[in-house]
Amino acid sequence: MDLQNILENNDRVFKFLEVKILDVKPGYSKIQIPYKEEFCRRGNVLNGGIIMTAIDFAGGLATLSVNDGIDQVTQELKVNFLEPMYKGPFTVEGKVVRKGRTAVIVQIEFRDSEGKLGAIALGTWYIIRDRVVKKEGG
């Protein structure tokens, strides 16, 4: 089973956003999300939380491509919103800036269908080596 199917079958947010994985290679990821009215705020522009969630997925996939541990979690995510986004589909690219033993730093860009930069982010993902993060008792 490929990564696209694994995430669609095991991550409800990934499935809700209709994320499509376009590319994943060491230190890099590229995903796409559609424009949907359900994702928009007043004025029919993409909601900032949707943008941040897509950015988190792209950064997480870039991290996964270099993760030599068992699991990972987002430790920090800083997003600068530059332009309102309403021309989908949207592409989100994550590039690993630095990989350490316990942390991976990723720069992420969010663009519209015309290539216009709508948001830029810098995130830190914590590498977990001894367990998988899950709900207690579940």
Swiss-Prot record:
EC identifiers of the protein: 3.1.2.-
**UniProt feature coiled coil, ranges:** none
Q: Recall the GO molecular function terms of this protein's record.
A: fatty acyl-CoA hydrolase activity
Q: Which InterPro entries match?
A: ACOT13, HotDog_dom_sf, PAAI_dom, Thioestr_dom
Keywords assigned by UniProt, alphabetized:
Hydrolase
UniProt xrefs under Pfam families: 4HBT
SUPFAM superfamilies hit by this protein: Thioesterase/thiol ester dehydrase-isomerase
Family that this chain belongs to:
Belongs to the thioesterase PaaI family.
Protein name per the record: Putative esterase STK_00610
Question: From what organism does this protein derive?
Answer: Sulfurisphaera tokodaii (strain DSM 16993 / JCM 10545 / NBRC 100140 / 7)
Print the organism lineage: Archaea, Thermoproteota, Thermoprotei, Sulfolobales, Sulfolobaceae
